[in-house]
């Protein structure tokens, strides 16, 4: 058995409940009150909170969950805390961040989707403004109101104007990346949708230093904020890393640790994770696993050169994850030296499943890279100037035992790791459901902070506090008839008991609803919609009700995520360079006219 998450056994819950009954830092108000919307009593010294958000990490990427990369510091937090095996998030980054920070469904926050994929028909509609709307309060707003200093260092992606930056959403100090990503070594954009890397400190444009590497610098900045703010106050520290989002980049000393690890290819890795998932009880023994997508390349059919290239891409990915963990360790050491570590609650999770997009199959991206100092070659892979990626096959392997990856509401896109540790949380494994909207109310309860006390709190939280589960007062905060639903850009999922319905758009989906029994079939291999039509209709009705309540908009006919990104990117480029493009087009047209006129005159002179 690998260290970290352990297979469940029948006595775990009883032992945890007994231990917690004598060791809780907070004295809860009772089971029934905890299950209702009450908070724990505050302790004499309120705990600090650290939220670590990894970008694009799969369920089994951390060592504690069975991953190949070395993540000893994350694993240490897992060993001393609660590890959630049935946690779901959004399939896209910005909606996850909005829900995580507010406890509110993404459509009610204003961040229903991301700017890169929104269709014109939705732009600016209620819930689709792509920034936190009035009346939506963050956990930073709430904690600052009860005396916390609130700090952030990392990716924001919840608006791109000064008014939409973290300082106007409860944060005292912030270094924030407004885009979906950026280069990890240099102060520059990572895709043509963005003209530059929009970094802001406390709402003002910020230039990165020459020796920048994202994971290191984000931790350095957070340490600086901790050391230069009022140490008499408890702190809320939000660390949303760029790792392991594209471009996948890592210092060579970390990448070198994985030489040869992935040489057997993506089929072998997907099968190995599937076997470990059964050993660890992440899925039942013998549960089926979905085949890799039909357009997946056969590893053995690749040339030796291509196999080496793609194995190296995954080595950099693992190196980037280990580098992030190393700097998390530096941050933890700083808290230990300051004497605050033992009174700090840590929450570690991922915003969605692994990224499948490639950097070698888009003419637009290749053209843009050539003008922005990027390459995708083996030489220097992961280092300055490299635009690293893992592609759809490795992403599907990383998402094992789930199906597909980021963007989709299959399990590979939305089932990710969750760890909560610190005062009031005993070591345990939690197999009951949890959703991204549950995190803010849970953290507020753990520190005894109110959830509905502010005058401008006009949008209610939709998530449920997991406090009763963490304290052993309940096995689950979701009953058999309670629904849990998600929707982003038409990709949708709804859970009820053991069942799940899901719908995914092209290119990997076909926009059809399907029904699965997740207890029997966590790989989503057998559609039950025809054999169990009553359950299907009941859950479709529940999703319709959810959509009406949350203000979900119907997608335009024929919506395709990749096509929409291309259109939106083209629009952005024309907005930035419209007059240059127009002038260039006129010059080309004039040259064509001149050439045609010259040809006409020449032909005329010959015939006269």
Predicted region positions:
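Active-site-proximal N-terminal segment of extracellular/periplasmic enzymes that hydrolyze or transfer
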Residues: 40-82, 91, 145, 156, ...
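Active-site regions of oxyanion-processing enzymes, predominantly non-cytosolic
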Residues: 44-48, 100, 160-181, 215-294, ...
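Long, internal low-complexity/basic segments
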Residues: 45-47, 54, 59, 83, ...
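Active-site segment of extracytoplasmic enzymes that catalyze sulfate/phosphate-ester chemistry
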Residues: 58-148, 173, 179, 183-199
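Short, solvent-exposed turn/loop segments enriched in Gly/Ser/Thr/Pro and often Arg
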Residues: 63-69, 83-107, 112-114, 152-164, ...
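C-terminal accessory region downstream of the catalytic core in glycan-modifying enzymes
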Residues: 82, 157, 204-205, 210-215, ...
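Histidine-centered active-site microenvironments of extracellular/periplasmic hydrolases
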Residues: 162-170, 249, 333-421, 567-577
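C-terminal cap/loop subdomain of S1 sulfatases and analogous C-terminal strand-loop tails that border
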Residues: 172-173, 177-183, 383-413, 421-519, ...
């Amino acid at each position: 058995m690998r260290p970290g998450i352990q297979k469940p056994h029948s006595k775990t819950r009883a032992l945890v409940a007994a231990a917690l009954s004598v060791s809780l830092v907070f004295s809860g108000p009772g089971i029934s009150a905890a299950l209702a919307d009450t908070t724990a009593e505050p302790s004499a010294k309120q705990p600090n909170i650290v939220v670590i958000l990894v970008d694009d990490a799969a369920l089994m990427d951390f060592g504690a969950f069975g991953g190949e990369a070395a993540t000893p510091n994350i694993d240490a937090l897992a060993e001393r805390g609660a590890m959630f095996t049935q946690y779901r998030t959004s399939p896209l980054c910005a909606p996850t961040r909005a829900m995580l920070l507010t406890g509110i469904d993404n459509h009610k926050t204003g961040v229903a989707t991301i700017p890169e994929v929104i269709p014109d028909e939705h732009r600016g509609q209620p819930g689709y403004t792509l920034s936190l709307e009035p009346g939506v309060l963050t956990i930073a707003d709430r904690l600052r109101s009860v005396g916390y200093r609130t700090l952030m260092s990392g990716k924001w992606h919840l608006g791109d104007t000064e008014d939409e930056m973290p300082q106007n959403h409860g944060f005292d100090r912030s270094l924030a990346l407004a885009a979906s990503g950026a280069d990890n070594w240099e102060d520059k954009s990572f895709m043509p949708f963005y003209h530059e890397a929009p970094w802001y400190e406390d709402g003002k444009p910020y230039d990165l230093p020459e020796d920048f590497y994202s994971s290191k610098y984000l931790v350095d900045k957070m340490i600086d904020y901790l050391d230069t703010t009022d140490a008499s106050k408890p702190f809320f520290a939000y660390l949303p890393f760029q790792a392991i989002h594209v471009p996948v980049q890592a210092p060579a000393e970390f990448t070198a640790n994985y030489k040869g690890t992935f040489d057997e290819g993506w089929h072998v890795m997907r099968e190995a994770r599937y076997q470990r998932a059964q050993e660890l009880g992440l899925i039942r023994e013998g549960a089926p696993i979905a085949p890799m997508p039909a357009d997946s390349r056969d590893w053995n059919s690749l040339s030796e050169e291509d196999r080496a290239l793609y194995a190296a891409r995954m080595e950099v990915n693992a190196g980037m994850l280990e580098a992030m963990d190393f700097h998390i360790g530096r941050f933890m050491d700083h808290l230990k030296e300051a004497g605050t570590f033992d009174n700090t609650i840590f929450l570690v999770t991922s915003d969605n499943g692994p990224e499948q997009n490639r950097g070698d199959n888009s003419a637009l991206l290749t053209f843009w890279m050539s003008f922005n100092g990027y390459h995708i070659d083996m030489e220097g892979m992961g280092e300055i100037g490299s635009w690293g990626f893992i592609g759809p096959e490795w992403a599907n392997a990383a998402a094992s035992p789930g199906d597909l990856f980021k963007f989709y509401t299959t399990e590979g896109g939305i089932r990710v790791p969750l760890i909560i540790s610190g005062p009031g949380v005993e070591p345990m494994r939690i197999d009951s459901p949890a959703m991204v909207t549950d995190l803010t109310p849970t953290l507020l309860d753990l520190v005894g902070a109110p959830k509905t006390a502010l005058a401008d709190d006009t949008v209610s939280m939709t998530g449920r506090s997991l406090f009763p589960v963490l304290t052993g007062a309940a096995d689950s905060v979701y009953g058999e008839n309670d629904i849990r639903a998600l929707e982003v850009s038409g990709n949708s999922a709804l859970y009820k008991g053991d069942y799940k319905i899901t719908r995914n758009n092209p290119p990997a989906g076909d926009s059809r609803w399907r029904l699965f029994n997740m207890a029997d079939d966590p790989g989503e291999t057998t559609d039950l919609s025809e054999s169990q039509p009553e359950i299907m209709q009941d859950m479709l009705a529940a999703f319709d009700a959810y959509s009406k309540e949350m203000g979900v908009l119907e997608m335009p006919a024929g919506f395709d995520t990749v096509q929409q990104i291309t259109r939106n990117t083209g629009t952005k480029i024309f907005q930035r360079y419209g007059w240059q493009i127009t002038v260039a087009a006129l010059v080309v047209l004039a040259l064509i006219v001149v050439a045609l006129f010259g040809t006409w005159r020449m032909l005329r002179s010959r015939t006269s």
